[in-house]
A protein has these predicted regions:
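Solvent-exposed loop/turn segments flanking beta-strands in beta-repeat/beta-sandwich domains
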Residues: 53-67
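C-terminal motif of bacterial Sec signal peptides marking the signal peptidase cleavage site
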Residues: 14-17
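Extracellular ligand-binding/catalytic regions of CAZymes and related secreted enzymes
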Residues: 20-27, 117-118, 239, 246, ...
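Short beta-strand segments within Ig-like beta-sandwich modules, predominantly Fibronectin type-III
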Residues: 71-77
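An acidic, glycine-rich "communication" segment
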Residues: 216-336
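Helical hinge/lid and interdomain linker segments adjacent to catalytic or ligand-binding clefts
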Residues: 124-237
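Beta-strand-rich modules
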Residues: 82-105
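Pro/Thr/Ser/Gly-rich low-complexity, intrinsically disordered linker/stalk tracts
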Residues: 19-57, 87, 102-119
Length: 390
């Protein structure tokens, strides 16, 4: 067991006025001492321990990973367990004392590097939903389908942010993250029910770093930026969160991208569409259908490829794909040009070993307030996506 001890020397300065009256340092905040990190090569868990200040007024602890990920704990503790720390990279943890009047002490920092070889080999799939997923009819219906087809058959695990440590590369090949919520604000940091917490995001990062794959649907496509697969500047910009309304049109996905000669990208035979009905007569081109008449939320969370300043030649789809090492597999059912990316397959890279399949089309909807005549197509598509990532 490796132990890293850090001892800080406090330097006290005494200031006196002309009248020899001591000036009390009323803002002094005693720091923690004796910070230790216990860990072992080949394992991901780390235990931090320290000695708390002796002065009165301490109300909690602040732990900072790599000078950016902050965890505030509203109780006085002297140890903290990290089940899945970053591996094969330099990482730092800083511990600070928090006080009831709002003061935060200077921190002690420990730095470590864990050598770890992922034992990838699982073939199960996990589904991650918000702790409060029952607040969404769409999320509830998706979970019910996943339970019946994967959990109950021993092929899957349902997890939430409160059980995120159950996500395990030795057990799971892929993880489906689903969030479809009325009223949620734009931006991944606003995802509900713990999906945007440091613990959740770090667990997804670690899973992908070990070669695990993600299926991100609906509002969860924003996690492409959270986990670092794309820059924040390229996060999904087409966004909807309203209550929606009755709509009798058939909605789905257009897998043929573009209309310029020599620049038409036909993905209609891709594995994610295997076995589905390619339906003609509804729009200019045939589409794969997801939903019929019903109450549609219109919750897009996808990419406007004209909004990022991409090179227009030969087209913005090609520019996006080259920049992000991805493939645009689908757009809105009525679109025949290059404007938008509704389904994007982000291929593994040297820096990001996991594959991410992002489905941000509003038509990918699990509850439309009644019977969906194309529910079998939606379910087949979802199963295909999961199989593609396994």
């Amino acid at each position: 067991m490796k132990k890293i001890n850090i001892f800080l020397c406090a330097v006290m300065a005494l200031f006196t006025s002309c009248s020899d009256v001591d000036l009390e340092s009323v803002n002094f905040s005693e720091a923690v001492t004796n910070l230790i990190a216990d860990y072992q090569d080949g394992k991901r868990d780390v235990t931090l321990s320290w000695t708390n200040p002796t002065m009165e007024g301490q109300s909690g602890i602040q732990i900072i990973q790599d000078d950016k990920d902050i965890t505030n704990i509203d109780e006085v503790i002297n140890s903290y367990y990290i089940q899945k720390a970053p591996t094969n990279t330099d990482v730092s943890y800083t511990v600070k004392a928090r006080y009831s009047d709002g003061r935060v002490s200077e921190g002690q920092t420990v730095r470590l590097y864990i050598n770890y070889e992922a034992k990838k080999g699982g073939n199960m799939v996990a589904m991650l939903v918000a702790d409060d997923y029952t607040a969404s009819d769409d999320e509830k219906d998706a979970v019910a389908w996943f339970k019946a087809n994967y959990v109950d058959k021993g092929k899957g695990t349902l997890i939430t942010p409160s059980t995120i440590n159950d996500l395990d590369i030795e057990k799971h090949a892929a993880c489906w993250v689903m969030c479809d919520r009325i009223g949620v604000a734009h931006g991944w940091a606003n995802l509900p029910g713990g999906l945007a917490s440091n613990g959740t995001v770090n667990a997804l990062k670690a899973f992908c770093a070990d070669g695990g794959n993600l299926l991100l649907t609906n509002h969860a496509t924003q996690l492409t930026a959270a986990v670092g697969r794309i820059a924040e500047a390229y996060a999904p910009g087409i966004f909807g969160n309203g209550e929606g309304g009755q709509n009798n049109d058939v909605w789905g996905v257009q897998p043929i991208i573009g209309n310029a000669e020599g620049q038409i990208y036909d993905h209609s035979r891709h594995d994610i569409y295997r076995g589905m009905n390619f339906t003609s007569g509804l729009y200019e081109r045939s589409i794969y259908t997801f939903e019929g008449a019903g109450v549609k939320g219109d919750h897009n969370c996808m990419w406007d490829l004209n909004a990022y300043g991409l090179a227009p030649e030969p087209n913005v789809v090609k520019a996006w794909e080259d920049m992000t090492n991805s493939t645009v597999l689908g757009t809105w059912n009525h679109v025949v040009d290059y404007c938008c990316a509704g389904i994007v397959d982000f291929a593994p890279t040297t820096d990001f070993p996991g594959r991410i399949l992002a489905v941000g089309l509003a038509s990918y909807e699990w509850n439309i307030g009644g019977e969906n005549q194309y529910k079998d197509q939606l379910e087949m598509f979802t199963g295909n996506c999961i199989s593609y990532l396994k």
